[in-house]
Amino acid sequence: MLAALTPDKGRDIATLMKNLAMMQSVCAALEKSGCAHLVYFSSDAVYDTAVSRVTEDTPASPQDLYGAMHYTREIMARSLAKVPVLVLRPTLVYGLGDTHNSYGPNRFRRAAQKDGKITLFGGGEETRDHIHVDDVAALTVRCLLHQSTGTLNVATGISKSFYEIAEIAAKQFGNRIEIITTPRANPVTQRHYDVTNLIKAFPNFRFIALEDGVARVHQEMMGET
């Protein structure tokens, strides 16, 4: 289950209710027809943004309607009798086909290409974990093949600052890109993932390093222009 209205489509109560209605329809259908295995794509937005180190045992404590929506839909999925459920909670995902243009690799590469500059929130001090969409897909396939259930955070375990990420994006253009810092409006927050459970489940999995992933997406992007 991947369908959802993301924050760029709305952050209000009306959007929340539309997303819950989607899940209600899915649950109603599965209650009638049954299902051998349900994989629900949630979000790391279910965790409190103040929590700096996250594991699957970190209590869910969403701080906005988007996070609350995903956590509610997780509960709805788990309420289905006799349906094995896996909840995946991905960190920030990047890739060529991104439609959200969220702050990070996706926005930075587009800004660099269009404007020749990348603007950061503050000095880009915050650290976040970013995962290439191909890794998300590959891990999902493994979960399906293993009939995995429970909850799994989908992250690399390596966090970098947004300034570092901007430098990686700028490097793809031969460092001709200006990186602009701005006055900080909000406190600096950090987030790191302990991916011990993921490594135990798939010990042979190798993530695409952020530097390699951004370079790959850049090549794909330039190939389209």
Predicted feature residues:
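NAD(P)H-binding glycine-rich loop region in Rossmannoid oxidoreductase-like domains
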Residues: M1-K18
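A hydrophobic alpha-helix adjacent to the NAD(P)-binding/active-site core of NAD(P)-dependent oxidoreductases
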Residues: T15-N19, L38, Y66
